[in-house]
Structure formats: C-alpha cells, structure tokens
Amino acid sequence: SVGFKAGVKDYKLTYYTPDYETKDTDILAAFRVTPQPGVPPEEAGAAVAAESSTGTWTTVWTDGLTSLDRYKGRCYHIEPVAGEENQFIAYVAYPLDLFEEGSVTNMFTSIVGNVFGFKALRALRLEDLRIPNAYVKTFQGPPHGIQVERDKLNKYGRPLLGCTIKPKLGLSAKNYGRAVYECLRGGLDFTKDDENVNSQPFMRWRDRFLFCAEALYKAQAETGEIKGHYLNATAGTCEEMIKRAVFARELGVPIVMHDYLTGGFTANTSLAHYCRDNGLLLHIHRAMHAVIDRQKNHGMHFRVLAKALRLSGGDHIHSGTVVGKLEGEREITLGFVDLLRDDFVEKDRSRGIYFTQDWVSLPGVLPVASGGIHVWHMPALTEIFGDDSVLQFGGGTLGHPWGNAPGAVANRVALEACVQARNEGRDLASEGNQIIREASKWSPELAAACEVWKE
C-alpha cells in the first residue's frame, strides 16, 4: 500500500492469522479469553496477540520502519471452552526475536504485561506456554537438578522428607536451631525456614544461619546421613540476598532457599547462578502464587509459573499436595509435576498440558508436597509423587504429642514402610492404611502419630 493510512483499525485484520504455520522457534501461548459482550472472539484473540507484542491502539507511521510480519505476535487458532459461556482459548505465536535471551523477566513483561488490563476483555488467563528449544538453551535452569542433588545427598530410591519449623515467627535463633536439630536427628532429610522468616527483630538472619548450621552438623554426625536446612536468603535487595547466600556457603551448608515470586525473577535467576557457581542447592517457595493463579478465568495457571521457575532456576519448588483434593485436580497437578521433572512432556489436554514441551536436557526440579499432610497421607503421597519429590510435614512433625524428634521418627518409619511395600509390589492406593498400621506395631512413635491424626 502506498503512503500511510492513519486511524484505528481492527486488530484482527493484522493479528488474526488462522493459516499461520507455527515455527519450531516460536514461543506459543494458550490464553483463556473472556471478551466483553459484543466483542467477537477473533477480535479479542487478535487484540491479545497485538497488545502483548508489536501492537498499539492506533496505526503509527513508525510501523513503516520495521517489518511487522517478522515481529508481530499472531493469534493462529481460537476454540470455545466446553461448558463455559463466552470463553475461548486463543492460541498466540510469538517470534523468538521479541524476547531477550535468558530473561524470564522480559518474557513475562511481554506476554503477561499490559495486555491483562485490556478494555475489550472481561478477563484473561494464560493457561500454558510452549518454550522453544532455542530459547530454553539460553537459560542455565536449576543450579543442580534431581540427579546431582541425589548424588550430593547420597539418598536414592525414595522421596526426601522435610519439615517447616514452627511457630514461624517469634522463636529465638538458639531455640530455632534446637527444633532443627531434633527433627533432623529423628530422621528427616531437611528442615525449612518458613517463607516469612527473613531477618526480623526477634531473630536476625546471621544468628539463625549459625545455629541452624550447628544443629545440622550435630545431627549429621550422630546419624551418619547428610542433612540440610533451607536457609532463607530472601531479602529486600539483591545485594543483601547474595550476602546471605555467601554466608551460607562459608558455613558449608548444602542448601539455601528463596521466595521466587515475591523476590522476583531477576533476583531468583541471580541467586540460581550463584548457587550453581558455588555448589549450593536452591529450594524455592511460591509465596504469592495464589494471587496470580487462583482465579479460574484471570491471571496465570501455576504450570506457567512452574515452567518459568525451571528456566530461572531452582532445585525444589512447592507444588501442592493433591491429597484429599478432587480427582481432576490430581491430574492437573501431576501434569505440572511432570513438567518440572521430566525432559520431555507430551501435549495432554486432560492434564491441562496444551503444548508438547521439550526441555532439551535442562535439569529437573523436585516438586515439594507441603501443607496439611500427616502420616496417614504417606501411602498416597508415595504413590502419586513417586521417588523424585520432597514431602514436607510441618505440623505433621512438630505436632507429635511426644515432640519433634519422635514426630520425625514417625514420618521416616511411615515413608520407609511405604517404599518397601511398593517395592514388594503391594498396591499403596488400596492397602495404604494397612501398611501404616502394620508399621506402627513396631514403632511406638508412629503409633502415637496415627492416634493423633486419625485417618
């Protein structure tokens, strides 16, 4: 076309391209779009593609200085959501050149930036992303990954056990260290700083790090097993965060922790790089995730946040428990658990996986099941999550009537019983309660725990 035609034109003329063949290098996104009444789905889908890539609300003459065809996002497919009125899944393809290499921050600023406040949409949710091989390869990913972690800890063939130290706020460093020691001495692999524990007036970070390290070495010497405590390095500035990680390294501990959403992806990626360079494992907590992922029609699904974390870097991440929830949620949760652990995951809509994802040998992340679980859940957890997971019992350890160490013993005995039963070919789903009962006959600690938390 000759000259430049000013004015507002429909997005769908430029950004809705149903004939587009997606490239292997494109980043693909699946959005759940709820248009305002009267807005056709094609226009809404095209608007999403435009606003999250090259588009603006009106035609600008500087468009003529670049090749939109090369840089624009394209809405290439739209399908109605079954059982929902006026909801659509819009598939958008983004050219790889729109994104800075190795930056989750930049990827999100584009894909889930301003577009979520867009007037023509009543609501918008990012359900899934396909990260192309070429982009995955620009990320370091998890500092160590599942296999290296097992080798460092010398623990194989079973899930790992953790416990969050409670009360989360108010303990002095010395008493906190004592609780850590008792749990590790009883048989847990890890204890954990609560995500809110950073460096408050009642317990400064350096004191906590010191007493936790002492507890850890004492428990290690007495049990002959390698122990860890997730020292929370999250801080108000990146510099302070790295300072804490450096001190953890100087103490010689195996693992530190970070709140990746409140801390931010830039801070998280910096910490992940430090951890790989210095041999520290990195435990990731997902505080704030529900702000983003809880609404069914707006925000982002957790599987997207999980993929982003695997790119940014973390060796463990909290990912829900599944136990006692609805069947459907179990499939969906297992979907993103596989996305965290496996090298290659096939598209499977029944599990909420919209795209086939190839991680091209990026290390895997251990999913952490945490929150409201106790010994009676152990068979189900072992069956659902398998060996490559961390099972975290906070109250389920510290709430034991005889104290922390017996609580830890109960959990370890229950876990070992479940793993042994599984290896003998028994069905944990149907025989779980019986397996726990049998084990509690020779473990008074487990028997007491079974009594407190009736099945």
From Swiss-Prot:
The basic functional RuBisCO is composed of a large chain homodimer in a 'head-to-tail' conformation. In form I RuBisCO this homodimer is arranged in a barrel-like tetramer with the small subunits forming a tetrameric 'cap' on each end of the 'barrel'. The gene is rbcL. It comes from the Eukaryota. The record marks 325 as: Transition state stabilizer. The modification N6,N6,N6-trimethyllysine is found at residue 5. It catalyses: 2 (2R)-3-phosphoglycerate + 2 H(+) = D-ribulose 1,5-bisphosphate + CO2 + H2O; D-ribulose 1,5-bisphosphate + O2 = 2-phosphoglycolate + (2R)-3-phosphoglycerate + 2 H(+). Binds 1 Mg(2+) ion per subunit. It is an enzyme of class 4 (lyase). The modification N6-carboxylysine is found at residue 192. Its EC number is 4.1.1.39. Mg(2+) binds at residues 192, 194-195. The lineage of its organism: Eukaryota, Viridiplantae, Streptophyta, Embryophyta, Tracheophyta. GO terms for biological process: photorespiration; reductive pentose-phosphate cycle. RuBisCO catalyzes two reactions: the carboxylation of D-ribulose 1,5-bisphosphate, the primary event in carbon dioxide fixation, as well as the oxidative fragmentation of the pentose substrate in the photorespiration process. Both reactions occur simultaneously and in competition at the same active site. The active site is at 166 (proton acceptor), 285 (proton acceptor). Heterohexadecamer of 8 large chains and 8 small chains; disulfide-linked. The disulfide link is formed within the large subunit homodimers. Its cofactor is Mg(2+). The disulfide bond which can form in the large chain dimeric partners within the hexadecamer appears to be associated with oxidative stress and protein turnover. Keywords: Calvin cycle, Carbon dioxide fixation, Chloroplast, Disulfide bond, Lyase, Magnesium, Metal-binding, Methylation, Monooxygenase, Oxidoreductase, Photorespiration, Photosynthesis, Plastid. GO terms for molecular function: magnesium ion binding; monooxygenase activity; ribulose-bisphosphate carboxylase activity. Belongs to the RuBisCO large chain family. Type I subfamily. Its main location: plastid. It is found in: Plastid, Chloroplast. It holds the Pfam family RuBisCO_large_N. Substrate binds at residues 114, 164, 168, 286, 318, 370. This is Ribulose bisphosphate carboxylase large chain. InterPro entries: RuBisCO, RuBisCo_large_chain_AS, RuBisCO_lsu_C, RuBisCO_lsu_C_sf, RuBisCO_lsu_fd_N, RuBisCO_lsu_N_sf, RuBisCO_lsuI. GO terms for cellular component: chloroplast.
